């Protein structure tokens, strides 16, 4: 039997551009409704979240534009790479997300997809788009930190 640590935590896909393009605030963990070949492809880390976003449509939360490549050993029953996937959340969380997305300028962005105890989970974050000058300021601060860190290493 497999050890418990084998199922602990494994990141399958990470949306690195989300932190660069958005101010991320509150985060939610949710399950996903996937087909069998999607699960197998996801476990092979064949997921792209670059243009993906989440939305509350009706009484359900959905992950839109996420790309899960077709499973390499799949047959004619293989899944479509880009389709809407239902997110599994508690009712109060869905209601909260619906209130949040009504505010102008806020969106729901998937930040990562990971395995937790053998189940595939998606982390979505409430996001507000950054302007170009915000991105420049963040880059400037990052380079200043890097230079200071390099200078400290040289002196030590």
Curated annotation (Swiss-Prot):
SUPFAM superfamilies the UniProt entry points to: Small protein B (SmpB)
PANTHER family: SSRA-BINDING PROTEIN, TMRNA-BINDING COMPONENT OF TRANS-TRANSLATION TAGGING COMPLEX
Compartments where found: Cytoplasm
UniProt cross-references to InterPro entries, sorted A to Z: SmpB, SsrA-bd_prot, SsrA-bd_prot_CS
UniProt-recorded name of the protein: SsrA-binding protein
Any single Gene Ontology cellular-component annotation: cytosol
Keyword Signal: no
PROSITE patterns cross-referenced by the UniProt entry: SSRP
Gene3D superfamilies: 2.40.280.10
Keywords: Cytoplasm, RNA-binding
GO molecular function, one term: RNA binding
Function: Required for rescue of stalled ribosomes mediated by trans-translation. Binds to transfer-messenger RNA (tmRNA), required for stable association of tmRNA with ribosomes. tmRNA and SmpB together mimic tRNA shape, replacing the anticodon stem-loop with SmpB. tmRNA is encoded by the ssrA gene; the 2 termini fold to resemble tRNA(Ala) and it encodes a 'tag peptide', a short internal open reading frame. During trans-translation Ala-aminoacylated tmRNA acts like a tRNA, entering the A-site of stalled ribosomes, displacing the stalled mRNA.
GO BP terms: trans-translation
Region spans: Disordered: 135-156
Protein family (similarity comment): Belongs to the SmpB family.
């Amino acid at each position: 039997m497999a050890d418990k640590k084998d199922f602990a935590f494994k990141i399958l896909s990470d949306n690195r551009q989300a932190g660069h393009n958005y101010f991320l605030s509150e985060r939610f963990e949710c399950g996903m409704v996937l087909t069998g070949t999607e699960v197998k492809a996801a476990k092979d880390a064949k997921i792209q979240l670059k243009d993906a976003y989440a939305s509350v449509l009706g009484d359900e939360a959905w992950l839109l534009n996420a790309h899960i490549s077709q499973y390499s050993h799949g047959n004619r029953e293989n899944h479509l790479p880009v389709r809407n996937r239902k997110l599994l959340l508690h009712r109060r969380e869905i209601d909260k997300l619906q209130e949040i997305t009504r505010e102008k300028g806020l969106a729901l962005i998937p930040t990562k997809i990971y395995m937790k105890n053998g189940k595939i989970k998606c982390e979505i974050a409430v996001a507000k788009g950054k302007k170009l000058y915000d991105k420049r300021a963040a880059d400037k601060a990052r380079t200043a930190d890097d230079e200071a860190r390099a200078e400290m290493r040289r002196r030590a």
